[in-house]
């Protein structure tokens, strides 16, 4: 069995097109799991992983979304180990998705939006508020806009979002 299966997995994710931030998150999550369980991947059971998730949640007061993210990363890793024939069956198969509440995002009222617009000190700030309010794009997406991404005639922007995916707004 290869010395560092985690490195091979991360390389596979890189080839699949995962972003450097995603790969770093996978790496830190799986390194923590590996250190905590202190046993070869071939010997890790579903019970080991459940205990790990439970301990992680309790010790770190982690939320359900965080725990499900960890479970999802473990699932991806162990599915890869199974696909590559390093293990017979993924121990994550029997660990179900963690139910999480979907929280509705708070929307600015028309009155609050007007107050925000009135307090803009420059045309630049006003343009930022207006484009965010009218398109629903993320702040990070707005920051990443270039002049070439804006088509004033069509009143459209080409936005690069999460995962380097582009979409018109």
Show the residue positions of the predicted features.
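N-terminal core-binding DNA-recognition domain of tyrosine recombinases/integrases
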Residues: 3, 7-104
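Alpha-helix N-cap/N′ positions at the starts of helices
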Residues: 4-5, 48, 108-111, 123-124
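Short aromatic/basic micro-patch
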Residues: 43, 107, 168
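Short, basic/aromatic-rich helical patch in the C-terminal catalytic core of site-specific tyrosine
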Residues: 74, 128, 142
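Basic, Lys/Arg- and aromatic-enriched nucleic-acid-binding interface segment
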Residues: 87, 102, 110-139, 163-166
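Acidic/polar active-site rim loop that often engages polyanionic ligands
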Residues: 96-98, 109-110, 159-160
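Conserved tyrosine-mediated DNA breakage-rejoining catalytic core shared by Y-recombinases
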Residues: 135, 144-169
């Amino acid at each position: 069995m290869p010395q560092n299966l985690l490195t091979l997995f991360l390389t596979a994710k890189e080839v699949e097109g995962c972003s450097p931030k995603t790969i770093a998150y996978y790496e830190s999550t799986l390194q923590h799991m590996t250190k905590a369980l202190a046993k070869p991947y071939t010997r890790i059971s579903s019970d080991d992983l459940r205990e790990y998730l439970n301990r992680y949640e309790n010790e770190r007061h982690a939320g359900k979304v965080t725990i499900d993210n960890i479970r999802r990363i473990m699932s991806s890793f162990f599915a890869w180990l199974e696909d590559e024939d390093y293990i017979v069956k993924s121990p994550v198969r029997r660990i179900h998705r963690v139910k999480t509440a979907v929280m509705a995002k708070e929307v600015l009222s028309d009155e609050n939006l007007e107050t925000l617009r009135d307090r803009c000190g420059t045309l630049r700030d006003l343009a930022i508020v207006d484009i965010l309010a009218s398109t629903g794009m993320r702040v990070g997406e707005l920051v990443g806009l270039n002049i070439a991404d804006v088509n004033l005639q069509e009143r459209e922007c080409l936005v690069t979002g999460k995962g380097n995916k582009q979409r018109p707004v």
